[in-house]
Amino acid sequence: MGSMMAFAFSEIGLDVSIWDVKYDNVQQLLESAKNTNYKGKIEGFKDVSKFTQSLEGKAERKIFLFSITHGDPADSVLDMIKKDLKKGDIILDGGNENYRRTEARQKICEKIGVSWIGLGVSGGYQSARRGPSLSPGGDKEALDLVMPLLELYAGKDAKSGQPCVTRIGPKGSGHFVKMVHNGIEGGMLSTLAEAWSLLHYGRGMGYEEIADLFESWNKEGVLRNNYLLEIGAELLRVKKTPQGDGNGEGVGDGGFVLDDVLDKVVQDDDNTEGTPYWSVMESASRHISAPTLATAHFMRIASGNRIERLEVAKQLRIPSPSPIRGMKDIEAFKEHLHSAVYSSFLASFCQGLELIARASEDEGWDIDLGKCLQIWRSGCIIRSEGIADILQPAVSGNKGIKNMKYIDTVAQELHRTYPSLKEIVMAATDSDHYIPAISATLEYLKYEGGTNLPTKFMEAQMDFFGAHGYNLPGVPGEDPGPVSKGPHHYEWRPAK
């Protein structure tokens, strides 16, 4: 990511100094930059002090861009360069950092007159080179100074030409929005993986046939211009060759590269990726129901520890997924699956945006959800034009909408796709397929729109053992009433 950013800024015309804890990484970047015609100069450094001094005198302020693993590594680098920082310098932290840690660094830097901006960067290393989606958050003066540069660098919305970057808000808001972006991404990734599995293992479709289907979904309709469908179709077509990719992978005389990929997602288990986990924790702590995002994350966790999973499989002896027995009409199945995937994608967006809205209110950030959707229109993993076209007009301009299901068009779409969602869940469950995100979306719609939940019984039991209190149905001020403890308690079993 850091290398791609360096190339991109040099191409814009900036002189770029680079440094890394591992000097080998610097040398690799410099080697890659040879014989290029970038407008700006790229200079590498082994010594961190010489690196920081190389920027002196070139501008009134030094601008640093971090592309560093979250947590202690970024703190360590800040400690290394702090003595060379001067009042007015700006640090852009482009890592996937926890927003609270960002705010802690902002306080440290504020004392020495330095601005620390939490810069969410989305789109993977390809977009980092050609134009990512950016979500900067921090003090307004520093943001105003760097925005012209970020607007040059950011991806551009194909429809409007607007750069996919905006001032998110103060403090850690930029990294919070990027965290939620990654949470939405997790829900969508799981949904599409589940759909692929249903098509391949459930309906016996080949990879290229599924690629054709994904391409058709991406071409038009509610799932149009969706990044994950785009790359999903692309990777499904990649076959092994005698040469492979030139780096030792994908070597073979036939078959698909996808068959070389084990079912292990380890970025969560080994702590190299924290944003999906933080999204789940934030949704729980801020009382936002986000089951599609959460259960997608939990399947990733289970996938990572394959050793343990294989042992559990021996103990549970649960049937493996089998060909789908229901819905014999394959075209009807595809239509239902299209609607179910769309519903789960849309629910992922609803859950993420509701989390941002709640955090913005809690923290006083004044985030415009419409601008979040605007910067997600290009350069990022959750790009989905059809969904953005539904949501963005309804939430732009801080209209105070905190529950996305209040939006008429959103409610209509979730209502319309509900029967297909149910059909897919029933067919998949009957044939023992893995559908955590899709099934969680179905339950989400059921209980989010439920008028008589089984929690009535739960509330009574909690009152029984803990005197938690309850509200009375049909009583003004209690039904529906505020989210607060009920005034009634019944002595179900008097203490003796």
Curated annotation (Swiss-Prot):
Substrate binds at N96, S122, G123, G124, H181, N182, R300, H468. SUPFAM superfamilies: 6-phosphogluconate dehydrogenase C-terminal domain-like, NAD(P)-binding Rossmann-fold domains. Pfam families: 6PGD, NAD_binding_2. The keyword NADP applies. NADP(+) binds at G13, L14, D15, V16, S17, I18, D24, N25, V26, I68, T69, H70, N96. It is found in: Cytoplasm. Residues 476-496 are annotated as: Disordered. It comes from the Eukaryota. It catalyses: 6-phospho-D-gluconate + NADP(+) = D-ribulose 5-phosphate + CO2 + NADPH. GO terms for molecular function: NADP binding; phosphogluconate dehydrogenase (decarboxylating) activity. Keywords: Cytoplasm, Gluconate utilization, NADP, Oxidoreductase, Pentose shunt. Disulfide bonds: none annotated. GO terms for biological process: D-gluconate metabolic process; pentose-phosphate shunt, oxidative branch. GO terms for cellular component: cytosol. The active site is at K178 (proton acceptor), E185 (proton donor). Homodimer. Catalyzes the oxidative decarboxylation of 6-phosphogluconate to ribulose 5-phosphate and CO(2), with concomitant reduction of NADP to NADPH. This is 6-phosphogluconate dehydrogenase, decarboxylating. It comes from Emericella nidulans (strain FGSC A4 / ATCC 38163 / CBS 112.46 / NRRL 194 / M139). The lineage of its organism: Eukaryota, Fungi, Dikarya, Ascomycota, Pezizomycotina.
